[in-house]
Amino acid sequence: MVTKKSKKAWPWLWFSVLVILLDQLSKYLANHFLSLGHPVKILPFLNFTLNYNTGAAFSFLGTENGWQIIFFAAISFVVSIFLILWLSRTSRSEIMMLLGLSLIIGGALGNFIDRLRWSYVTDFIDFHIKDWHFATFNVADSAICVGVFLLIVHMLLTPSSKP
């Protein structure tokens, strides 16, 4: 169903801006109050541990000599432009799709800002079970994951118009 699109979908970009602001504020606080590599226990399964990631998710390509920073920044920018265009063409009634796109855009641009400013992304959220630690991540990464999840759920729940 395509109704009330374009201009009416643009306010969802303000939600992306909110995600960017929360991400950048959390990274500022992490850099201000945490020490690199020294975990601070928050809950039995959660630490805040400052980490600088020059790669992508799970530090993919993080040990390369620097080309990956430009590569991942470019991908973040291009994907964000594509998603903004998609958002502008999405029906205002498709709330789950709009929310998912907004979260992904905000997360991608939050990490894009880090790559441009510092040549790395600040990660600090460290989930663990005893001595097993999941990859350290940040608010932008969380927004991207939740956004992708919402898009998948939306696509699974929305009937296809094709026979």
From Swiss-Prot:
One of its GO terms (cellular component) is plasma membrane. It catalyses: Release of signal peptides from bacterial membrane prolipoproteins. Hydrolyzes -Xaa-Yaa-Zaa-|-(S,diacylglyceryl)Cys-, in which Xaa is hydrophobic (preferably Leu), and Yaa (Ala or Ser) and Zaa (Gly or Ala) have small, neutral side chains. The chain crosses the membrane at residues 9-29, 42-62, 67-87, 93-113, 137-157. Its EC number is 3.4.23.36. Pfam families: Peptidase_A8. PROSITE patterns: SPASE_II. It is found in: Cell inner membrane. The active site is at residues 123, 141. Pathway: Protein modification; lipoprotein biosynthesis (signal peptide cleavage). It is a multi-pass membrane protein. One of its GO terms (biological process) is proteolysis. One of its GO terms (molecular function) is endopeptidase activity. Keywords: Aspartyl protease, Cell inner membrane, Cell membrane, Hydrolase, Membrane, Protease, Transmembrane, Transmembrane helix. InterPro entries: Peptidase_A8. It is an enzyme of class 3 (hydrolase). Its main location: membrane. PANTHER family: LIPOPROTEIN SIGNAL PEPTIDASE (PTHR33695:SF1). HAMAP family: LspA. Belongs to the peptidase A8 family. This protein specifically catalyzes the removal of signal peptides from prolipoproteins. This is Lipoprotein signal peptidase.
